[in-house]
Amino acid sequence: MKGIFYGFRPHFLDFFSYLCRMEKDLQERKWKVLSSEYVHRDTWLTARRDCVQLPTGAIIPKYYILEYPEWVTTIAITKDKQFVFVRQYRHGIGETRYELCAGVCDPDDASPEAAARRELWEETGFGGGSWREVMVISANASAMTNHTHCFVATDVERISEPHQEQGEDLTVHLLTLDEVRELLHNDEIKQATQVAPLWKYLSEEKLI
């Protein structure tokens, strides 16, 4: 037994050293910002142009970054196991699609969960229930500064009529698990930041 541990130790130390080197290497890969300027700023779009230097020494004189506030999306499920979806037109792809309730974290929101609760109530009129965050992801890590906080809310119920903002034109739909599965399998849900948490939730709950 003693010989086994003696024989194992060098390999363990080598692996530990490898992890340390890998972590250091990852830390050293961060780009250096040489200069930065805003090229567009308004309510819905803030674009920044950076001049950056890579760890290799190469310089990219024009690297464009889009600054956004944090986003939220919610898998809301009623007490009778129906999924709360909305259906709306998305001008970017020119299509009307089923989506989860989602939105932006406002400065007045105390937390991403508070923002998600507000968005669910405003868009669908549903609220209450038990909430947990399932993942935090990036829609485009190479060019966007924000993250999407993804929640699951179970046992939600209709507490009021929707309070949709001007410019919002959507309808509320309650879908069964089979209908959600079908949407996913047929690639009918186009928002990547909604597809990811849906697959994760269904996988964790062994519903696929």
Residue ranges, per PLM feature:
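Hydrophobic alpha-helical membrane-insertion segments
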Residues: M1-H11
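Extreme N-terminal tail/first-helix region
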Residues: Y18-D42
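Short, positively charged and aromatic/hydrophobic N-terminal segments
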Residues: G7, D14, Y18-R21
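Nudix hydrolase/Nudix homology domain
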Residues: E23-W31, T96, E133, S142-T145, ...
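Acidic, metal-coordinating catalytic segment for phosphate/diphosphate chemistry
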Residues: S35-T73, K79
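Active-site-adjacent beta-strand/loop module that shapes the phosphate/pyrophosphate-binding cleft
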Residues: R48-T56, N140-I159
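Conserved Nudix-box catalytic region and its N-terminal flanking loop in Nudix hydrolases
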Residues: E23, E28-K30, Y63-Y68, T73-R118, ...
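Short, well-ordered beta-strand micro-motif
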Residues: R49-Q53, A76, V152-T154, L174-T176, ...
